[in-house]
Amino acid sequence: MIELRANPDIIRARLAARDLAKAAGLGVMDQTRFATAISELGRNAVQYATGGSCVLQDLSDARQVRLQAVVQDQGPGIADLEQAMQDGFSTAGSLGAGLPGTRRLSDRFDIRSSHSGTCVTIEIIRNKRL
């Protein structure tokens, strides 16, 4: 588990995601996709919730590479998830591309939010060449 409290933690999570993807045999493009998604989620946790945690797992089997990341925080939650998932929506004056972009970078994307925090689970899945 990687604690997310400040910018250096986001960098550490991004590098760990890239290293996990590389060790799993993913190409540079997929390594970058996974690392970028983790960076976006980590930044949200630090910026909007004053921190959280990131757990990276390799759930691969004989048929496919399957990498999972779970990023959680204990912030105030997201008031309107549907709106937050729209490109361009932001409560902080940013571009509003983080969550929608992360969804596009991921093969699986799940977000749950309440007044006690937000949890985002993403996966990158690739079939192995047999």
Predicted segments with their positions:
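Conserved beta-strand-loop-beta-strand hairpin that lines the nucleotide-binding pocket
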Residues: 1, 42-130
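Bergerat-fold GHKL ATPase/HATPase_c domain
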Residues: 1-36
